[in-house]
């Protein structure tokens, strides 16, 4: 038998075995967080969407990020990234944990804007006047808030 034909038959048989195995053993849902949007209908417009615990101290980078956040982000995302009902989501939320939205996601969001995909607030426009370094410091501030609030 030709070696190429033998190799082809082997690959087909192996592929079939993998497909059969996957059909018999479907992937189990992970025990991650819910991606369902919470019901905020009982909250007043502009009300914070999260109760944010503030850490005892921030790193120097997070302190600079906090100042930049307050100038460029808090108008929509609220004080301490708690979000605002009807305006923008809280960034101190499981949805934005590092395993789901890495720090680069914040850089890209600020640079390019974001099409609404987790929440019903509409699209986020690009943020003018921030460098990548500024956004990385903002991300550091958000990560330290998230850590203080048990997000990761």
Name what the model sees in each region:
Residues 33-68:
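Electrostatic cytochrome c docking/interface patches
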Residues 61, 102, 106, 134-135:
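Stable alpha-helical elements in mature extracytoplasmic
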